[in-house]
């Protein structure tokens, strides 16, 4: 099962450098903290609508593969992050199977818990980069994060109802 927002997320084209944009827009796109927390700061109840979750092979992650270690399997999680039930963000997380060891096994068991609630409580979280992307008038971003030095890739598409717009 897929969702149109995830199709658009996969169509994002990324800027080679951070573009010159309105400061308020950049504030959202370059946020280093949890997007879940940012949405909650808008006075909203944040929830996750699960689109897809499970192991995939390399052929199902062509956009992410150049940014991750080459492995036989990856954990894929695709969601809509909703604010008071309205989708504000589409998210796609790709986790190499080698990352899923020790405490990071919890990444497979998030269920309807927003990823940010897990990631941003970890003292071992680091971010390699944020890339800004755009497709058909919508903005997105992609980050390679590390937990205890182990990589995962998070791509987010801000949907039309999001306060980013």
Swiss-Prot record:
Membrane-crossing segments per the record: none
Any one GO biological process: pyruvate biosynthetic process
Taxonomic superkingdom: Bacteria
Annotated pathway: Cofactor biosynthesis; ubiquinone biosynthesis
Reaction(s) catalysed by this chain's protein: chorismate = 4-hydroxybenzoate + pyruvate
Record's function text: Removes the pyruvyl group from chorismate, with concomitant aromatization of the ring, to provide 4-hydroxybenzoate (4HB) for the ubiquinone pathway.
Designated name of the protein: Chorismate pyruvate-lyase
Taxonomy of the source species: Bacteria, Pseudomonadati, Pseudomonadota, Gammaproteobacteria, Enterobacterales
